[in-house]
Amino acid sequence: MAETNVVLDAIRSRRSCRAYEGEMVPKELIETVAEAGTWAATGMGRQSPVIVAVTDKAVRDELSEMNAKIMGTTSDPFYGAPVILIVLALKKRPTHIYDGSLVLGNMMLAAESLGLGSCWIHRAKEEFETEEGKKILEKAGVNGDEYEGIGHLALGYPSYEEKPKAAPRKPGYVKWVE
C-alpha cells in the first residue's frame, strides 16, 4: 500500500457504525466533529451548508420516527446514536448537494480520528420538506424553505467489540489516461 499518515489512516480505517452505546458524547467532541465539517471545500468557497447538532433526546427521537416513517420501518434508523448532526445546504446554490456531502465526509473522518462511530443516514431531504421537519429547523434558526436536507450523521461511541472489516476495493476503481 502507498504511503501513510494520520489522514490516510483515518480514511482507510473509517467504517459506518451501526451500533452505539447510549452514553452521550461530550459537547467538546461534538464541536470538534462539527468544526471539521465547516472546513469542507464548497463551490466557490460560498459555504452553503449549515450543521444542526441535535443532542436533545426528545428531538432526536422525533427525527428518528420521521425518518423511519419515510423509510417504511419502525426501527431506529440512527441505530441508537445519541447525537445527530444534520447537514443542510442553501437550495439556491447549484453546488449545495456536493457541498453538504463534503461536510458529511469531513465529519465522518473527524469522528474516526477521535474514536467515535458515525454513519451517514439518508432521507434528510424528505424529512425537512415536511412542516414537522421545518418546525424542528426553526428551533435551530434555520429557514426550512431555503435549505435542503443533505444527510444526517449519527454520532456516538461504538458498541461493537471489533470494527467491521472493509470490503476489498474493487478492481479497476481508478482509471488512468497517461
Where are the model-predicted features located?
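Acidic, surface-exposed loops and disordered segments
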Residues: 1-178
